[in-house]
């Protein structure tokens, strides 16, 4: 019987690759997505497609209104999504999003008896979010083992971030080898209802540059 793992699945390029890698590692993957009030809801439809295509045992979508707090261009329509690189942490950072998602994954893992959680964060070709850094992942794993019944009873809980030190091109090559159909993923911060990308935001830039560096055709559909 395969061991269970929780895989955080946004519907984007990175999380799809993380799911494929977890499956390749021999886990029965339970995919978890978060409907947090993001403007790019097309990624949730993409997550459902990817969970099915990549053999997830189960896919759940948790609704949690982080958008009620605002504070991010991804949850507040009055804040424009930047279309050029900015210094510092950009307004597309969603406060505590990865912390909340990992906490939900941890709760589900305890219920299922899973000891492994996968998250597709990256600290090489990324937008500079503080909750994508290795220090954060390491700290959350320590907390998980202190704050759970499983951890206190001696079961080692592990937070896997297999993409953390890979370039976007390396991620794309890895996922392609594992059968990820990147045409089904949505990365754009302001994708339209059909999942077509704007081609101008930071997520689109990183994705486009990644395919270019990988020497592979970019399957992204653009709105214009």
UniProtKB/Swiss-Prot annotation:
Zn(2+) binds at residues 188, 198, 201, 204. One of its GO terms (molecular function) is ATP binding. It catalyses: 7-carboxy-7-deazaguanine + NH4(+) + ATP = 7-cyano-7-deazaguanine + ADP + phosphate + H2O + H(+). One of its GO terms (biological process) is queuosine biosynthetic process. InterPro entries: QueC, Rossmann-like_a/b/a_fold. Catalyzes the ATP-dependent conversion of 7-carboxy-7-deazaguanine (CDG) to 7-cyano-7-deazaguanine (preQ(0)). This is 7-cyano-7-deazaguanine synthase. It comes from Thiobacillus denitrificans (strain ATCC 25259 / T1).
